[in-house]
């Protein structure tokens, strides 16, 4: 054959040799079809986008990630690829917390059929800090409803524009029969919910117990 292990795609000649006619009555000639008897077809090369992550910041994601290649032959590498790498998928322009596809495209190679596989962009929720609001109650009464101040909003957002719903909870060190004094309580996320924020950091507030009247 005129092809070798490193020959590129195409059709190659295959010659049959070594045959003889014991009687000497025949002469062997190469068939015309032998000229294209061997076809080298493209190898399959998979190009996979790596995963990426960011924390919600109100800005749209653009661009891509690292690439992983699977299927190169003959010690070849990414430097044989041509074209302009681009990234598509619903990750492009993604803003809100969630998972999105990062899909590579735009590359080619003479001896390969390229298959593009997506990676995942994860936009994580931004963390909010809940600081317990100070409150008071009379001796023997129940604690008032807990409330908290939220900090950590990004991109100029606030409680309303960030779409926060619900209210804070709390765990108090003061019991119903605790004497007059000041006690710490730790706010909790309660029923708070928001698409792009997580309620994960907490600063204690104070409950002041005053004498009963």
For each predicted feature, which ranges?
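Solvent-exposed beta-strand/loop surfaces, strongest in extracytoplasmic domains of secreted
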Residues: 1-213
